[in-house]
Amino acid sequence: MERALCEVARGGPHHLLSVRWPSGDLREMRARAVVEVARKVAEHKSLPRGLVQAALHGGRQASHAWEQAVANVPAGAAELAQALEASQATGKPASIIAFSLGCRVVLYAIAAGVIAPGSVERLVFAASAAPASDFEVLPGMLEGGTSVVHVFSKKDAVLDRLYPLGERKTRPSGRRALEIPGVENVEVDVGHRGYASIAARLWDLAVAPGEG
C-alpha cells in the first residue's frame, strides 16, 4: 500500500503521510491463519480435526496479534508526531492517508493532541479497522478546517472475518459509511488488499477536494 501511494505522490506539490501499522496488519493475520490450517490438517491427517485445532489455535494467535497491535498504537502515534514535524520543513501542505489499523493510530494521535486541528489539510481513512465510536474525535478537526474523507467497501471480507470476536458489537467502520456530519464518505468496489490498486484515487482524495 505504501509503495503504491509513494509512486503516485512522487514529486507532487503536496506532502503525503501514509499510516499503516504493520505489527497488526489484518491481511497478514489472515495469511498466518491459512498457514496454520494447512499445518494442523497435515499434523492430524484429518480435515475436520485439523480445522478444529486450527480454529482454536488460530483464534488465540489472532487475539494475541490484535492485542499487540492495539498496544503499539501509542508508539505509532509518537512516530507520526515526528513525521508531522519533519513534514513542516518541506513547506508543502500536508495530508494523511491512514489504512486499516493505521486508522487507529491517527485517531489516537488526534485524541492525544498530536494532530492539532488545522495542522493538516485533509485526513483520508481507508479500510478502517477502527470502530465508528473512535471517530468521535473528528468534529474538532473539522471545525479547525481539516477536511475528512472516509473510504469504505462493503466487499472488504478481511475486515468482516478477522475483526476480533471480542469486538463484534462494535464493527469496523471500513465496511460502511460513517455517520458524522462534515465527513465525506466514499464507497469503493475493492477488497482489503485491493486498496493498493486505487492508490491514485486515494491520492486525489487527499489533495483535490471534490475531485476524488
Segments the model singles out, each with a brief description of its role:
Residues 109:
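Aromatic pocket-lining residues of Rossmann-like dinucleotide-binding sites
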Residues 96-102, 106:
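Gly/Ala-rich beta-loop-alpha elbow adjacent to hydrolase catalytic centers
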